[in-house]
Amino acid sequence: MVPRRPASLEVTVACIWLLTVILGVCISFNVDVKNSMSFSGPVEDMFGYTVQQYENEEGKWVLIGSPLVGQPKARTGDVYKCPVGRERSMPCVKLDLPVNTSIPNVTEIKENMTFGSTLVTNPKGGFLACGPLYAYRCGHLHYTTGICSDVSPTFQVVNSFAPVQECSTQLDIVIVLDGSNSIYPWESVTAFLNDLLKRMDIGPKQTQVGIVQYGANVTHEFNLNKYSSTEEVLVAANKIGRRGGLQTMTALGIDTARKEAFTEARGARRGVKKVMVIVTDGESHDNYRLKQVIQDCEDENIQRFSIAILGHYNRGNLSTEKFVEEIKSIASEPTEKHFFNVSDELALVTIVKALGERIFALEATADQSAASFEMEMSQTGFSAHYSQDWVMLGAVGAYDWNGTVVMQKANQIVIPHNTTFQTEPTKMNEPLASYLGYTVNSATIPGDVLYIAGQPRYNHTGQVVIYKMEDGDVNILQTLSGEQIGSYFGSVLTTIDIDKDSYTDLLLVGAPMYMGTEKEEQGKVYVYAVNQTRFEYQMSLEPIKQTCCSSLKDNSCTKENKNEPCGARFGTAVAAVKDLNVDGFNDVVIGAPLEDDHAGAVYIYHGSGKTIRKEYAQRIPSGGDGKTLKFFGQSIHGEMDLNGDGLTDVTIGGLGGAALFWARDVAVVKVTMNFEPNKVNIQKKNCRVEGKETVCINATMCFHVKLKSKEDSVYEADLQYRVTLDSLRQISRSFFSGTQERRIQRNLTVRESECIRHSFYMLDKHDFQDSVRVTLDFNLTDPENGPVLDDALPNSVHGHIPFAKDCGNKERCVSDLTLDVSTTEKNLLIVRSQNDKFNVSLTVKNKGDSAYNTRTVVQYSPNLIFSGIEEIQKDSCESNQNITCRVGYPFLRTGDVVNFKIIFQFNTSHLSENAIIHLSATSDSEEPLESLYDNEVNISIPVKYEVGLQFYSSASEHHISVAANETVPELINSTKDIGDEINVFYTIRKRGHFPMPELRLAISFPNLTSDGYPVLYPTGWSSSDNVNCRPRSLEDPLGINSGKKMTISKSEVLKRGTIQDCSTCKIATITCHLLPSDVSQVNVSLILWKPTFIKAHFSSLNLTIRGELQSENSSLTLSSSNRKRELAIQISKDGLPGRVPLWVILLSAFAGLLLLMLLILALWKIGFFKRPLKKKMEK
């Protein structure tokens, strides 16, 4: 089980990483991304997996770990030294450190040790390099303990350390050979011995082998401790010859081996497992002793393998049954795993492999007390850290991959017990596989040192353990836990002293596999602040969100991801670097090697106080495509000035290469601005421009420059600056003198400090309510080279020139505005197409000090449109979403009153039930809260909209005659037999700009007399597509049009009497629903039911057909003239003059006599009957 670092992804593409292309777009501060120094190596070797900056007497270097050097045959790994300096172009040199990295007295396996996976510099000189997959062999077993080497400043291995142990899988093996005469050929036995012994690791601390030969007698060919290597044993075995004999004393040979060969005098080791291999070709002559001899072997725990050679029996054609049973009885249980038989001596070699494997299987169980691995698979050196006098070595594979931290100090080595770091009780032998020691670090606090180790698989969410060393014992102080399963919280640890007081300020914990919202491995870094001996959570850092697009089907995707997994793995590397931006605080660099589809990127965070700023100061992407340039940001180191300019430089590695980025110095530029005069007094003109008096102002701007790294030296900076007048306004109220421009741009060389002067003048604008802001922007003339501007200081400064205020002797103007509002309508507004406007009258008064920039702001509902303004003086109104009217110039004095009207027009696209208007009066002067109650007015007026339409009605017949001699048909075959048809037409046509509502048209007509006889019979109706009329039951209710016949009896006709009018007739109504349309039509067909009128007594009467229109929308109304239409159809009977009743004749005669009498009386009164001529003649 080999833990993998999160970014150690399988590399399948061979490439050379030319990091000179790492010039991608970045948010830039003072790390120079365009002039970096690059180092390249095979991506298959994982060149760049680790990087360290290094200096010795020979010069300055970048050390680069390449843990897969030697692949594909082996993965030995190594470290390269790469010379640095702007003038250095020498290639990187492989140090061949694995050659001299060795542990004596063990059988080493270096082929896949991945040397260079861990690389840290020693503060006292030299460096430490580790190969966590270094292994040694115990018998047939390989133990991956890991190894670390101290390397001197001159790149020589000083010593190596690995937690190797004496092989606890030692075996003492005695081979008991039948050397009787029947064994033939003896060379086959020798070949068997050679093949078997070659498979064994023979030595004093490993497996020992002795050989006993028997026939009639027993001989010790050599003892267990005779030879100390496999080679020596092989030479001796090849010299053994067959001693012969006429008897096969198997019991004697086994018993002699038990009693003598397994004694300490002959080299047997106390506590080591005893193994006996018996090889014979025939039944024993002392088989009566075998049972007891085998029992004695059992009592002494001697494991026995027995081999029966059947050659003698096969050659003599003898039965082998009894022989096989005897040899089986010799073998240990289970017999099937300890007994072998071969057809003859030549076949012995065929069982060597199986026999060897079964013997080797005993190695794993040689230590019967070992229930699990301890340090055998520890992978010590998976991580490493120097902490004062201690060296911390992470051993993730220790104790069944629960892990531990090996502490090494001079000649003292502390390997904590397997339960030392268990923070919670666990079941016996429970395999936690927490990977403790995945990363290690330390924190310095006043008077003490805290040691920190990460175990990213603990409880699946990860954990960080903080502990102290007290007299060689581990004392756990605190644990920090991750929040997300599988995030690998604790796989990366970094401590940093931000303020350079020699004490740790922060602990940063990486969780590079932290999943984002879209299940992508975005990564997260947790920041903890040191509080005495405890760490307290402060904040989390996250990368730019990566969009994972497996295809371009998603509209948000512009580029398809070609590599998996997707994300950033932000926090794969977290490095504390010395003060990059020369602000007195150390900084942090974090790697995100999966960003940009595995191209990678790093983020730089600047220190501040005792913490770091949450927002990154610079992001450096690799600029690669994720194929030829992979995982930039896998490793980071930044502790040294490698080019002699006094600034810390940063080395960043990935798979296939590394790059050294130079830091650029930081220029501090401070600017001050002064104005003369310092206020704009529009009533005091001090200059003349183009013949007009105005106000002119002189602006003095002073630049002060210095370098952060060399504050005492003189610095000359080439600057470019731009001055913008009235920068808060879209239209400027001022221009530079001699121009009509609001902006000027100039270059300036500043040596320590320099002042310049620019003058400008005010325009004749009516807008003086706020200050004139003057903005000065500046930058270095060549921002790509040399120092950069300090990002802690602004590169833009602002100066404000206020307007002088008319407040007497007061420093502040305190106004008191009032607002009165009235409207033409208050209760209900009926809006018509020809009359869709209304007025709002405003009165603004100031009862306090002068109010500067007095204005009214009018907000109104969407059903209103600003149309215009009337009667306002001096100023005007602007309308965007609201209406702002400036009142007074430039201020509204005490007692001033301004009256004006705002005209609104109704918006036909928004028909609301109310017109809502909010009006307020305000100014730039102060106004007490208690006087603001009369500065606002709210208006809400109900609104109805009168729909403009034309409602027409007409009929095909207005007069129908019934002949006196007409008869009633006895059988009605069609509607033509009933009477004349009357077609009634209704047309509704839209007019005006208001929308047409849904309408309801009710068409009513006399349908039956009071006695139930038909009057007007509806045969059907038609309409335009937007109209739906009901009920259908009124349409031809008798089914005449469908061919149904009906008869009228004479008795029914005789019942009809006189019809004077139709006031008592029963009315039928057709209701039509009209959807909005420019034109709607409804046509109704009616038949005058003549049988009702033929025998009736009447001379003439009128039938009235009414059409009534109604709006279905409460906001849209109809005018009274457009609601009803009536059509009169006159019915008369020809040939029968109407008889006048007697009472009518008598009443008319009386009325005529009365009128005559009144006329005579009136004439008499006026003297009409007097003769004035007669009187004159009498006189």
Swiss-Prot record:
What GO biological process terms are annotated to this protein in UniProt? cell adhesion; cellular extravasation; integrin-mediated signaling pathway; negative regulation of cell population proliferation; negative regulation of epidermal growth factor receptor signaling pathway; neuron projection morphogenesis; neutrophil chemotaxis; positive regulation of MAPK cascade
Q: Which residues bind Ca(2+) 3?
A: 641, 643, 645, 649
Membrane-protein topology: Single-pass type I membrane protein
Task: Specify which residues bind Ca(2+) 1 according to the UniProt entry for this protein.
Answer: 497, 499, 501, 505
Write out the topological domains of type Extracellular. Answer: 29-1141
- Chief location bin: membrane
Cytoplasmic face: residue ranges?
Answer: 1165-1179
Q: Which GO terms describe its cellular component?
A: acrosomal vesicle; basal part of cell; cell surface; external side of plasma membrane; focal adhesion; integrin alpha1-beta1 complex; perikaryon; plasma membrane
Q: Which residues are glycosylated?
A: 100, 105, 112, 217, 317, 341, 402, 418, 459, 531, 698, 747, 779, 839, 882, 907, 938, 965, 973, 1007, 1083, 1102, 1113
Its annotated function is as follows: Integrin alpha-1/beta-1 is a receptor for laminin and collagen. It recognizes the proline-hydroxylated sequence G-F-P-G-E-R in collagen. Involved in anchorage-dependent, negative regulation of EGF-stimulated cell growth.
Q: What is this protein called?
A: Integrin alpha-1
Q: Which organism is it from?
A: Mus musculus (Mouse)
Q: Which gene encodes it?
A: Itga1
